[in-house]
Amino acid sequence: MKRILLALLRIYKIALSPYLGSQCRFLPTCSDYARDAIVQHGAARGTWMAACRLCRCHPFTKGGYDPVPATHGTAAAPPASAAPGRPPVTVRLPRP
């Protein structure tokens, strides 16, 4: 199912997107967001996340940077290069 959804997104980006123009107010674009969400979270949850994102993308929204949230457990895992005994450095970026 995941491969079918990704193929449909690829067809949309190649066949329809050039004719519709860039209308997305977010970065990454809604189609890129959908692809990333499906890859990271699977077909069902990724499709739900993409549908919610499409509902947020309208002319009255501010838009801005809105990446796909990380899967549970990956954000808190320390990097492999972290020194033993020292906590990893966490960088928090301001929300747009």
Swiss-Prot record:
Membrane topology (UniProt): Peripheral membrane protein
Bias-annotated ranges (Low complexity): 71-84
Family annotation (InterPro entries): Membr_insert_effic_factor_YidD
Disordered: annotated segments: 71-96
A Gene Ontology term for the protein's cellular component: plasma membrane
Annotated keywords: Cell inner membrane, Cell membrane, Membrane
Pfam family, any one: YidD
UniProt cross-references to SMART domains, sorted A to Z: Haemolytic (SM01234)
Cellular localisation: Cell inner membrane
TM region(s), chain numbering: none
PANTHER family on file: MEMBRANE PROTEIN INSERTION EFFICIENCY FACTOR-RELATED (PTHR33383:SF1)
NCBIfam families: membrane protein insertion efficiency factor YidD
Family membership noted in the UniProt record: Belongs to the UPF0161 family.
Protein name as it appears in the record: Putative membrane protein insertion efficiency factor
Natural source organism: Cupriavidus metallidurans (strain ATCC 43123 / DSM 2839 / NBRC 102507 / CH34) (Ralstonia metallidurans)
